[in-house]
């Protein structure tokens, strides 16, 4: 009987930790320009139907607040970047979220995507083609509310 209780408690703790780690990536994140180090936008990471998505809430670059995605394809072509979902379809895989895509609004190109927490306030976002080694990594910072 004691073993059943111990295993039940351990299972419950593992489940709570898994849910807690997933919710830690949720929230608002400030994206940083690779070249200048300046803040570019605020992206909200949210969950829908068990998958992770990211939507541009705000453009921080002066004069680009109303920019459209000129290089995008399909239904995103010439649509405002503000309000656009740029990360979609990520699922939890151990300590990462992968299996989805990220859109670079500057080039209009889509890449495979993997995200993970470096720490409570730093999100590692990697876009790549083919293998994860062939890609680019950005670090986003959590927006304090």
Per-segment meaning from a language model:
Residues 23-28, 93-100, 121-124:
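Short, hydrophobic/aromatic-rich segments at coil-to-beta transitions
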Residues 1-24:
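Bacterial Sec-dependent N-terminal signal peptides
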Residues 46, 91, 116-117, 141:
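Well-ordered beta-strand positions
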Residues 34-36, 105, 116, 130-131:
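Short polar/acidic secondary-structure junctions
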Residues 23-38, 138-145:
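K/E-rich alpha-helical interaction surfaces of small helical-bundle regulatory domains
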Residues 33, 38-103, 110-111:
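Central antiparallel beta-sheet cores of small beta-barrel/beta-sandwich binding domains
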Residues 120-122, 129-145:
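Edge beta-strand at a domain terminus
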């Amino acid at each position: 009987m004691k073993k059943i209780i111990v295993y039940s408690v351990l299972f419950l703790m593992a489940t709570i930790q898994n849910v807690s780690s997933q919710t830690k990536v949720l929230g608002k994140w400030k994206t940083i320009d690779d070249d200048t180090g300046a803040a570019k936008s605020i992206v909200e990471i949210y969950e829908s139907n068990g998958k992770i998505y990211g939507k541009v809430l705000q453009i921080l670059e002066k004069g680009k607040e109303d920019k459209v995605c000129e290089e995008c394809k399909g239904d995103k072509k010439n649509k405002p970047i503000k309000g656009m979902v740029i990360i979609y379809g990520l699922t939890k895989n151990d300590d990462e979220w992968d299996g989805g895509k990220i859109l670079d609004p500057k080039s209009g190109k889509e890449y495979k995507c993997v995200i993970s927490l470096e720490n409570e306030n730093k999100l590692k976002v990697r876009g790549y083609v083919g293998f994860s080694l062939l890609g680019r990594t950005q670090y986003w910072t959590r927006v304090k509310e």
